[in-house]
Amino acid sequence: MKAGSHGIVVPVNASEFIVLSDEERKDIIRFTVEQAAGRVPVIAGVTTQSTYQSVEFAAYAGKIGADGLIAMPPYGARATDDEIVEFYKRIGDAGRIPVFIQNYVPPVGTVMSPSLCVRIMQEADYASYIKEETQYSSQVITEIARLAEILPKEKYLGTMGGKAGRYLIDEYHRGVCGNMPACDIVDIDAKIWNLLEEGKEKEAIALYNQAIPLMNMEYMYGYVLYKAVLKKRGIIDCDSVRVPGGKRLDKFDYTELDRILKELEPYYQV
C-alpha cells in the first residue's frame, strides 16, 4: 500500500498458492484483510483442485471481509463448460462478493473461450470481472468486451490483464480496467497506470520501456524472480521457494537483474 498499489490479490500464482497448506492460505487472506483495513480492496484467491475446496475458501473469504474472489477452474481434472459455469456460481454464492474469472494457461489454468467467459457472467450472479492471461491475450480482451455488450452494465465490470504487466500499454488502449502483476515492482506498475489515467501517455510509455526488461525476466522465471527482487529491495529476508519450485537463477541472471534494478531504483516508493 505504501508503494501505491490500488488493491491486493492473495494467494494466487505469484504467491505460490499451489504449495501452501489450507491453513496457510486462510492465514494469508485473513492477515491481508486485517492489514488493508479497508484502505484498498483485497481479492482472495480460491483456486483449488475441486469445487468443494474452492467453495470452502470462498465462504471463508467472504466471512472475514475480503472484497472479492479470483479463481481458475479446478485443476485436479479438467472440467466441462457446464461444470465450469457451475463452479463460478457456487463460489460466488458461497462468498457473496464479486468474482474475477481467471483465464489462464495449463497446467494449472484452464483456457476458456471468450464466449464461455461471457456465459459465466450471464449465469453466475457474482461473476463480473475477467483476468485474462491466455495466448493472444490482448485480442481475447477485445473479443470478451465485444461479446459482453449483450450483458447489463452491472454484469460486466471489466477485464484486467496479467502476464507481469508486459502488455499493459496495449491492454490499456483496449479498455482494460486494470492489471494484476506481481508485487515486486508494484510502485512502478502503479505509476505507469496512474500516468495513463492522467493522460500522460508519453511519460507512461517511457517508464514502461524502462521496466520491460524486468517484466521479461519475471515472465521467464515467475515467483523465483519476484522473490529475488523483493529480497534485493530489502522487503523480505529469504527468497527460497518451496519444492517443486521454478528454475533457479544463475550468476548471469543475477548480474542482469542487478543491472536492471539499478536503472529502476529511482522510481521506487519504498
Residue ranges of each PLM-predicted region?
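Catalytic alpha/beta core domains of metabolic enzymes, predominantly
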Residues: 105-219
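General structural feature for long, well-ordered alpha-helical segments within catalytic domains
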Residues: 24, 28, 53, 57, ...
